[in-house]
């Protein structure tokens, strides 16, 4: 069984905890990680961008000038794409970009991402992550103790002091364990997890 050191917020070692091999020390399936990120990013897209083509743009029902005898190229409508004020040719239209991924594959992707960070020694476990007051300086001090910059902090319970202390720090995100996802794990590259959050993650992902 995989193990990991447990620290307090000053990076003093306070113990060792066992990790579920299936969740934190399993096979890293990069294709699943890629698929999960692709699905997440696609589902964020609103798909509402739209332009007017020549059928939609207002006006242009009349032929601008007669067919023959003017010496100019024949034209049927002043709202054709090559006219100023004309419709756009092949422009974007509203589209649904949503993709889906089954629950089993989605969980496997999160397990793979966590296993990847564990094997790269980018996973840190704290006994708890509580700040006595709202303090950005105090939060940054904790990150400096662990020599971390781009970091995802995963907690089990809502922690207002922690969330408000971290929200003005660049490249840091505080997330509840139940909202853990592949995109954030890969994006932030380092992850700090509380002991209780580890057990919550294992409970969700091992099933």
Swiss-Prot record:
Record-level Gene Ontology MF annotations: rRNA binding; structural constituent of ribosome
Database matches in Gene3D superfamilies: 3.40.1370.10
Top-rank taxon: Bacteria
Record Pfam families: Ribosomal_L4 (PF00573)
Biological process according to GO: translation
InterPro entries listed in its UniProt record: Ribosomal_uL4 (IPR002136), Ribosomal_uL4-like (IPR013005), Ribosomal_uL4_dom_sf (IPR023574)
Keywords for this protein: Ribonucleoprotein, Ribosomal protein, RNA-binding, rRNA-binding
Assembly, per entry: Part of the 50S ribosomal subunit.
HAMAP family reported for this sequence: Ribosomal_uL4_B
Name of the protein this chain belongs to: Large ribosomal subunit protein uL4
Phylogenetic classification of the source organism: Bacteria, Pseudomonadati, Thermodesulfobacteriota, Desulfuromonadia, Geobacterales
Gene, per the UniProt record: rplD
């Amino acid at each position: 069984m995989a193990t990991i050191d447990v620290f307090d917020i000053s990076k003093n070692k306070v113990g060792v905890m066992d990790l579920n091999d299936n969740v934190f020390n399993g096979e890293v399936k990069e294709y699943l990680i890629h698929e999960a990120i692709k699905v997440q990013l696609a589902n964020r897209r609103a798909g509402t961008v739209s332009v007017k083509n020549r059928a939609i743009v207002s006006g242009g029902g009349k032929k601008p000038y007669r067919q023959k005898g003017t010496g100019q190229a024949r034209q049927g409508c002043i709202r054709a794409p090559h006219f100023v004020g004309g419709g756009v040719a092949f422009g974007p239209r509203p589209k649904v970009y949503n993709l889906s991924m089954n629950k089993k594959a989605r969980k496997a992707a999160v397990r793979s991402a966590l296993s990847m960070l564990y094997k790269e020694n980018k996973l840190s476990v704290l006994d708890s992550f509580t700040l006595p007051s709202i303090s950005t300086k105090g939060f940054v001090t904790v990150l400096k103790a662990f020599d971390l910059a781009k970091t995802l902090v995963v907690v089990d319970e809502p922690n207002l002091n922690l969330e408000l202390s971290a929200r003005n720090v660049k490249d840091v995100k505080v997330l509840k364990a139940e909202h853990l996802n592949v995109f954030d794990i890969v994006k932030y590259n380092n992850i700090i997890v509380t002991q209780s959050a580890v057990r919550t993650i294992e409970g969700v992902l091992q099933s």
